[in-house]
């Protein structure tokens, strides 16, 4: 089951205890999902692929208007999964009464392209309206893949009003036009979690948080591993350079010609090529800090550079002091 479907299934089980919230949720769903056809009579169509949502809208509609909508199930083509569910209400007067009661139309089927403030006057109604809108035309990506939640609308004015409802709860949705639709979206994981809390999807919220925490831990571990790998690569590259310098000195001058402090660090460097500067310093007698080890290795590098350039070593340059 997809993350979005699981979320909508949870929303469809939420009990509505107030008539104003029942009205707000139903108004949002019908406004965003409904379509009208006029063939002899007027028919209101609602469509969803989620049977739980179909049952909920049927139940809420019956509770609100004491009427039953007709439910039709349509099987999809062979290559497509699942079924499509249509909720149908027929009759010009009945449809007109429902749409005007829900503030979706004004007058005789004159569509209200925004959200009537009365529908979302209360905080609880704002929550219910967002819940209905999400069930109608909302989607949420699995957080394992990406952080993304969106709702689409046919009218920009309507989407702007929907965004204002979201902003009431201190959400900061983005907005874009996609083909013939307008889209409101959230990409910040914390804001998506807050949206789920607002619409009452608390189980989905916990699941989302769990995935988010695990994803964060994996990313942190990966960063640490990458950092360790990078540090190891730097250590290896530096170690190879040190060993090459030591070989140059040994072949052209002889390590025995070096002061004891430089001899010791040269021998330990060759014996422990994988050791970093801190570890190398701890192998010396007495132990030496990172800066001390680095200073000695730089002296060896300068000696090797002179031997490489001139073929001999001038003791007067002070590198052996």
UniProtKB/Swiss-Prot annotation:
Q: Name one GO molecular function term.
A: DNA binding
SUPFAM superfamilies reported for this sequence: Homing endonucleases
Query: Is Transport among the key words of this record?
Result: no
The highest taxon in the source lineage is Bacteria
Matching Pfam families:
HTH_WhiA (PF02650), LAGLIDADG_WhiA (PF14527), WhiA_N (PF10298)
Record key words, sorted = Cell cycle, Cell division, DNA-binding
Does the keyword Cell division feature in the UniProt annotation? yes
A biological process from GO: regulation of sporulation
Q: Which residues bind DNA?
A: 276-309
Q: Which Gene3D superfamilies match?
A: Homing endonucleases (3.10.28.10)
- Family designation: Belongs to the WhiA family.
Q: What does this protein do?
A: Involved in cell division and chromosome segregation.
Q: What is this protein called?
A: Probable cell division protein WhiA
Native source organism of the sequence: Natranaerobius thermophilus (strain ATCC BAA-1301 / DSM 18059 / JW/NM-WN-LF)
């Amino acid at each position: 089951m997809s993350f979005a479907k699981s979320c909508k299934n949870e929303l469809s089980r939420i009990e509505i205890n107030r008539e104003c919230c029942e009205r707000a949720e139903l108004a949002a769903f019908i406004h965003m999902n409904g379509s009208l056809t006029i063939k002899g009579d007027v028919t209101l169509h609602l469509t969803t692929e989620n049977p739980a949502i179909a049952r909920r809208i049927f139940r809420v509609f019956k509770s609100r208007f004491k009427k039953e909508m007709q439910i039709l199930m349509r099987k999809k083509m062979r290559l497509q999964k699942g079924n499509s569910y249509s909720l149908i209400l027929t009759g010009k007067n009945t449809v007109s009464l429902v749409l005007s009661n829900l503030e979706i139309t004004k007058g005789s089927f004159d569509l209200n392209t925004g959200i009537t403030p009365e529908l979302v006057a209360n905080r609880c109604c704002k929550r219910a309206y967002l819940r209905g809108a999400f069930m109608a035309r909302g989607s949420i990506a699995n957080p394992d893949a990406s952080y993304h939640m969106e709702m689409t609308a046919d009218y920009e004015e309507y989407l702007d009003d929907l965004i204002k409802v979201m902003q009431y709860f201190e959400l900061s949705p983005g907005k874009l036009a996609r083909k013939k639709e307008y889209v409101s979206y959230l990409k910040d994981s914390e804001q998506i979690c807050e949206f789920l809390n607002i619409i009452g999807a608390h189980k989905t919220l916990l699941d989302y948080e769990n995935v988010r925490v695990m994803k964060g831990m994996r990313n942190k571990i990966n960063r640490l591993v990458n950092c360790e790998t990078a540090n190891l690569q730097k250590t290896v590259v530096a170690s190879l350079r040190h060993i090459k310098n030591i070989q140059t000195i040994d072949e052209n001058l002889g390590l025995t010609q070096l002061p004891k402090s430089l001899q010791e660090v040269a021998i330990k460097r060759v014996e422990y090529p994988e050791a970093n500067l801190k570890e190398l310093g701890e192998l010396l007698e007495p132990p030496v800090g990172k800066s001390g080890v680095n200073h000695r290795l730089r002296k060896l590098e300068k000696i090797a550079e002179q031997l490489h350039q001139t073929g001999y070593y001038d003791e007067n340059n002070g590198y052996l002091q």
